[in-house]
Amino acid sequence: MQSGGIPIFEPGLDAVVAANVKAGRLSFTGDMAAAVRKAEAVFIAVGTPTRRGDGHADLTYVFQAAKDIADNLDGYTVVVTKSTVPVGTGREVQDVIRAARPDADFDVASNPEFLREGSAIEDFRRPDRVVVGCGSERAREVMREIYRPLFINETPMLFTGRESAELIKYASNAFLATKITFINEIADLCEKVGADVKDVARGMGLDKRIGSKFLHAGPGFGGSCFPKDTLALLKTSQAQGAVTRIVEAVVNVNDARKPAMARKIAEALGGELTGKTV
């Protein structure tokens, strides 16, 4: 990556990385000790896939990263969870680090990301908001300094408790998934009554209270975030004894959507897919 090789595809990312490496603002290293000891803030940005068998988020990589960071802390450091994690993970990360390094001077903050694949650079430069969950003014000041370049865009910076920040991410994704699921069910109704779902969505979206984003009927939501995040939120709610019937319905409706769409495709092709390219 230091020489310009980017392991993922994101439009414009290679140029941004190359320019900042050349300017000396960005560097890459595999030396954990050197990186952590020089840092005022260390971000944990690792995968949190759905755990096989029970639907909960797998936090193995998060806790391993916390242990690796703990081994190399030197001076006051803010450890920031950037990964999408269930409520209470920040407290667990703090416990992991404290157990490994009782003498360490650190805070744990939650700073969820809201980037969209394909427009991540623009979303980072002009975010709707920056959410930071932490409990100390010292940590808040470090996070303010990190995001100060965005202040010229008047980006709202919301400071909350850790648990609130963690839940904001899950609740946001669940709400967007709900909009997608809602318009899909309206699309099914449109087919029955002879209405055009595109016109219905357009008429709904012009209401500023609703907005037009995520009102596009289709095969349901997918990708790397919405399915695992809605399921993780549902599992967290169930574990806490909280009722989230809307989220449960969204997950169930979306799961049923894909086979239903497959049946519609088959019907449109005369009921037989053998030998056909879809």
Q: Model features per residue range: what roles?
A:
Residues M1-V278:
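Structural/interface elements that position substrates and couple domains in central-metabolism enzymes
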